[in-house]
Amino acid sequence: QSPEYHRVTRFRGNAVPMDRPGHYVYLRDAKDGDYWSISWQPVGKPLDQAKYTCRHGMSYTTYECDYKGIKASQTLMVPMDDAVELWDVRLKNTTDKERRISVFSYCEFSFHHIMIDNQNFQMSLYCAGSSYDENIIEYDLFYEEFGYQYFTSNVTPDGFDCLRDSFLGAYRTEDNPIAVERGTCSGSHELGNNHCGSLQKDLVLAPGEEVRLIFMLGEGSREAGKKIREKYSDMANVDAAYAQLKDYWENKFAQLQIKTPNEGMNTLINTWNLYQAEVNIMFSRFASFIEVGGRTGLGYRDTAQDAMTIPHSNPEKCRQRIVELLRGLTTKGYGLHLFSPEWFDPDAKKEKKKPFKSPTVIPTVNAKDIVHGLEDACSDDALWLVPSIIEYIKETGETGFADETVTYADGGEGTVYEHMKRILDFSAEQVGATGICKGLRADWNDCLNLGGGESAMVSFLHYW
């Protein structure tokens, strides 16, 4: 799924302050009005007054804060079986006095589509609405038939805000939201404007008491939210979701373990390298410093390199990506630098898509313009696919894969082996006066793109 379409919460790639907005939990002391966030940002209490920790694990992130006798944590994770993000919040009163603490959640909903989210505000500011009922915030993008999200909790809220600007206040930021500062949400909701998910819960913590709250940000309508809330209000189901994720990754790691004299190197290779590879093969580079979610499709070289890394841990996904890349190859032997797999997938049109009814004219892509010419071909793109296929066959033993028939992007079909041969032949033909492979539009270094040069790296890759 591309985050160009149907993104749930807002992402500003070049925001100031940096890395905003997030999925935040604020805490407020009713006695003196002091407030802070469980994660260091956005409130940013001085580090000599509060202790903060952030830990990234396998498919979860935990923030921890120890401030003024309140130890708090917030863990974000997505269960494998449900389209919901769980915010597992725990608070403990470590003092010998009763504490009255208000908890405020906050996330900022988007207008789903990156173009609508960043332009034509005359339209976009009226394209969504929010409502609160049965302790659930429902967010609705009007131009999508199924454009709903919800935000709810396992406890009965004492307040809510559905409007971003009502929660934050005029000329304020996530640093100092007016709702948290005054200690109460305003109950805002509206058809139109910018929306958020904020639920308020007022707690009374006895000395040493610990409480656990679960906030749920999910895909679907209020009815879907009710079902998810019922399920994850049972802490046993939350813990089971953690256990399922843990088992999933332990099974991945068990496929291959590297041992070196350096423990840091072992952790890097066995844990984080595989985790990064698995995430990349699933999501590609859809959201990164390059695209911030605005580039739909697969980068040819990126995906070919991704496929090379996980045939032992995820052979099914490796095979899928290889086939998609083979379909994105032209009969001349170069790959389409950027393409959507569905363009060349014969079964893609059979999938049920969420209809998006744009109020403005969106030009239809002409099929003949999808396949770019040699002038836009990168010399290294398709070469990475050859070793990826070889590694897949070596790991799985599926030698018959080389004889399977796959289509070309510009028409016709051939075996996997024939695709590989065209890739190698293309590089052998695209050489300069010295016999070194041409750089074409660019080799692996996209910044060297003035054309006319030769690439030692591509020549080495071709020989390999």
Q: Which residues does each PLM region occupy?
A:
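Hydrophobic, small-residue-rich alpha-helical packing segments that form membrane-like cores
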Residues: A50, M58-Y63, D81-V84, T94, ...
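Short clusters of hydrophobic/aromatic residues that line enzyme substrate/ligand-binding pockets
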Residues: I258, F283, F401-A402, G439
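Ser/Thr/Asn(+Pro)-rich, low-complexity disordered segments
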Residues: V204, E209, R295, A382, ...
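Short, charged, low-complexity loops and linkers
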Residues: L256-T260, D403, T407, T415, ...
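A glycine-rich phosphate-binding loop feature that marks nucleotide/adenosyl-phosphate handling sites
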Residues: Y106, E342-W343, R441-N445
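Anionic coordination/interaction segments
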Residues: Q1-T303, P315-G328, P355-T364, E391-E395
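Short glycine/proline-rich turn/loop motifs
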Residues: R285-E291, V365-D369, D443-L450
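Aromatic-rich carbohydrate-recognition surfaces in CAZymes
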Residues: Y26-D29, L298, T303, A307-T434, ...
